Amino acid sequence: MTGPGAPRPYRRTAWGAAAAAVAAAIPCAFLLFGTGPSADWQDRTVTVPRGSRMPEVVSALHEGGVLRHPTVFRALVYLTITSRRLHYGEYTFSRPPSTFDVWKKVVHGDVVTYKVTVPPGANIYDVAALLREHSVAEPEAFLAAATSPSELERLEIPGNSAEGYLSPETYTLVKPVTPEEILEDMVRMFRKKFTPEMERKAKASGLSLHQVVTIASIIEKETGIDGEKPLVSAVIRRRLALGMPLQMDPTVIYGAKRFDGTVTRKDLRTPGPYNTYTNRGLPPGPIANPGMAALEAALTPADADYLYFVSRNDGSHTFSRTLEEHNRAVEAFRRAAREEEG
């Protein structure tokens, strides 16, 4: 038995263990939460490739100059059982990160995102340019995917390109992403929006999906006013029923790839599959990617017997039943244009 004044070894042992634990924790905490010098730090972007396993993730982060202690990172991943939660993508670091900061960002998938908005009426060339503008994909690669027979077959798209089936929408993209994946996202969105009810309407009208999308694309390029779209649809349907050429300028522009919107008399006389002045019926496929209003109008035209329309030069149009009415509307438009000029 020890007396009141005798030393207590177990207390010394406990204090020693605690001190050792603290001594060990300090460097561990530094390795986990410490950051590098920030004086000369510049924003750094690191890409973790798709399908990377933990060794590849660690390598990308370390070689990218944002992970100073790979061993500590690996230990943290193992201790937290998060090896299957490491996200691929592009990561930006605006200040020197700690090992914990890097782990948290990669586990949460805090990647750089790119928002690309495809407006109604954009064609595949416009979409390709948008992807380049946002540094997501090269135009040539996207256009190659959008016209690849194997891709079109895989996505069940009729025709010789994905034109018309790239749904106007704002897409949130994460790099690295392939043109084929972008294409699939846009086509999947189209399939989602084109409802079974719309499919039933098309069938009841005696139109294939491709014909509906083609008509809708012409409507989209002819007018930006939703209220006019059913009227343009009625003109198209009536001309088709009567065997008249559609005589729609946007189809000629698309065929000539003159996307500044101008069309010449020579263009109108030049034969080609998209020239609806020299050909009867619909062109071989869509000329743009139509929005929902144009698709609905293609399926449900207005109950009207118009055969003609002309621009008022303010975005709206005058619709006519006869050629005589149409010629008067054209003359009125030209007169107004002359007065405006001078």
What residues fall within each predicted segment?
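Signal peptide-directed extracytoplasmic domains
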Residues: 33-194
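Bacterial extracytoplasmic/cell-wall-associated proteins, especially those involved in peptidoglycan
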Residues: 53, 130-140, 148-342
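N-terminal start-of-chain detector that recognizes signal peptides
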Residues: 16-21, 64-65, 88-90, 142-146, ...
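N-terminal type II signal-anchor transmembrane helix
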Residues: 3-43
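Short alpha-helical segments used as structural interaction elements across diverse proteins
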Residues: 8-9, 50, 71, 323
